[in-house]
Amino acid sequence: MHKFKLLFYILVLYAFIFSNNAFSASKKCTNIKKICNVLDKVVGIKTPMMIASGTIINENLIITNRHVVEDHKQFIIKFNDGKIKKAFPLAHNFPADLALLTLNKEKDIPNELIYSKKIKGFINVVAFDQGRNSNRIYKKGKIISFSDITKYPQGRIHTTANSLPGNSGGVAVDEDGNFVGILASGDGNINEIIPIVLINHILK
């Protein structure tokens, strides 16, 4: 049984790294240019348990969900141009389903993430698509609720923007390509996004 699990893991890892769809950057994006540019800000993440998504904060730092990272010690990261690197978790004690990954084991953490306080128009989820084995912009949707973070620190944005299993850790953006938040969960109809402002609580 152990050998079967090991073989399955190797096959999944091989497909994740060497798929013909690896170089998604070569595919023409037909969306708004500002949203198309976000494709290079998203990565695929391979853990011992799943394939998920992550969002690049700077050249060394990636944010994803805590439920993706769990207690694993390292991860395989696939960039939009097909490059593969290892990443390692950085500890934090802020109570949110967010996790930081570093590409060089150094705590090269910015003091603050600059973000827009206004959300323009509809939003899209940009994440790693397991089926295509490449980054993808999903069908746009509207925000249906947005809690006051000052009163409800764990409040989430609820949206009709489409996503699929394995998109956890991907980023939601508005029509200007501004980060709105990090995808956390959903049921295929209504999805939950962790507001981007909460990332700054982790960076502190």
Predicted regions and their residues:
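Boundary at the C-terminal end of the N-terminal hydrophobic targeting segment
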Residues: 19-24
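Active-site region of chymotrypsin-like
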Residues: 27, 34-49, 104-111, 135-204
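Conserved active-site neighborhood of the chymotrypsin/trypsin-like protease fold
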Residues: 42, 50-51, 58-137, 153-154, ...
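A cytosolic small-molecule/anion-sensing beta-strand core signal
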Residues: 57-58, 175
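Bacterial N-terminal signal peptides that target proteins for export
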Residues: 1-9
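Bacterial N-terminal signal peptides
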Residues: 9-18
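Short secondary-structure capping/turn segments at boundaries of alpha-helices and beta-strands
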Residues: 30-31, 87
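Conserved hydrophobic positions within beta-strands
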Residues: 56, 87-89, 143, 179
